Amino acid sequence: MYFFTISRLTSFISYGILGALGILTFLYLYDAYLAKSFQRLVIERRSKRESLSKNLSPNDNSHNSKIDISSDYQLLNEYKVAYYLRPGIIPLNHNLAKQEVFVFLHGLGGQMSQFQKVMSYFPPTACLFSFDYWGCGLSRQAFPNQRIGSVDQLTTKGLSKLTYKVLEKLFPENTQFILIGHSMGATIASRVSKMLQTRCTALLLLNPKIRFTSKEISMIVRLRKTPNAFISLYRLLDRFHGLRSSSVTRSLSKNIKGDGDAVRAQLWLWNRQSNTKIWKTMLMGLEELLEPGFHFPKCPILILFGEFDPVSSLKDKVFFQDYPGNYTFKEIDTGHCSMLEQPSEVYNCIDSFLDKFSTTDHNI
């Protein structure tokens, strides 16, 4: 009887393991199927937009420049990162004029390609720069075997130091910078602005994370104790819902203007590319924008909120009263990824903001 029971239990466990493996295999196969389908959708819609754009007025500033980050990126082997650089009208080695560079910094789980639509609204005279942090986007693709020496390198402070080193490496000493950061990238931009001092002429913060709620802090504590494999499985299950997965819906508003399905599909693909280990390590070292003792630079600061953003809102501007700065607050009807939903509106906000405060030509 004893051996019979053990035999049945062993069989039950074996069938359970086989069943679990079967389900997991199905999930991965379906995930790959969705990825191919969404990639095809994104390409088809992009081709359609490019075809229609040929009939638009040449005076439409939204089509002054065509940008393809995935094809035109370069590698900085010293720091093992991929970057995109469009020099603009003034060569970067020009010593007779101060070069002004727009620097785009992506957020947690993001990549520089998320700025492509916004960048396309900038005229050819503007110098544009962005790069993917270690283990993100094209940097991960170009350096797949890179090992991070210390988790401190992936904290907000570590990524800020990396950003500063990359800028110092690629640009001359007289270069001036306009920093544009999204979400976590907004916090990094604010830290880098302090390192650049007077060389940072403007700071533009898109959907910044101002403060952590007690619920968010509890979630981070739980994730710290959760094995990466379980987090990856949760992400896989979430992606099973396709365009309605929570990782997509929490980042975008319900009523996206334009081709909403293409935007959702592209965001789903970017989320899939995000490495769980890198994402978790960055999250564990994530700082709030308004850290105690932090002081913003004296340059003009634009803080752009999304009306339907669950991460931050215009109401959060009350937190800035204890942090002196030359602020301009703006809200548009988007979710957390404002530059994906309404790139033209984000560009217009940047353009009008710089026109208001600038005494020089920003080439925008």
From Swiss-Prot:
Residues 1-8 are cytoplasmic. Residues 30-364 are lumenal. It is a single-pass type II membrane protein. It is found in: Endoplasmic reticulum membrane. One of its GO terms (molecular function) is triacylglycerol lipase activity. GO terms for biological process: triglyceride catabolic process. Keywords: Endoplasmic reticulum, Glycoprotein, Hydrolase, Membrane, Signal-anchor, Transmembrane, Transmembrane helix. Glycans are attached at residue 326. One of its GO terms (cellular component) is lipid droplet. The chain crosses the membrane at residues 9-29. Its EC number is 3.-.-.-. Its main location: endoplasmic reticulum. The active site is at 183 (charge relay system), 336 (charge relay system). It is an enzyme of class 3 (hydrolase). Belongs to the AB hydrolase superfamily. This is Abhydrolase domain-containing protein C57A10.08c. It comes from Schizosaccharomyces pombe (strain 972 / ATCC 24843) (Fission yeast). The lineage of its organism: Eukaryota, Fungi, Dikarya, Ascomycota, Taphrinomycotina.
